[in-house]
Amino acid sequence: MEYRKFGNTIIARIDKGEEILEQVKEIALKENIKLASIQALGAINDFTAGVFKTDEKKYYSNHFTGSFEIVSLTGTINTMDGEFYSHLHMSAGNDKGEVFGGHLNQAIVSAT
């Protein structure tokens, strides 16, 4: 991963094989970021996204592998109980035009 700061903005390139949430956390801790918004695009080949079913009060995760383009990745960095916390949602599409997404649990970059 490589990143640069431009005032209050950070632009990052996460390398092939790296996990997105781990890299976001690394930057946030290194730069002492306590509050931020995030947006991203790129290609991934392995990701897990979840959905909270409010009527059941239960969380469900779905795991996907294959070639995907990130359609949207957006969210926030903040703190919870004084510790780093990120809340990101992602949608990713495959070569058939199918799009899957939800609360991002993990995603591996496949191309930069």
Tell where the protein language model's regions lie, with residue ranges.
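N-terminal intrinsically disordered, cationic/polar leader segments
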Residues: 1-87, 91-112
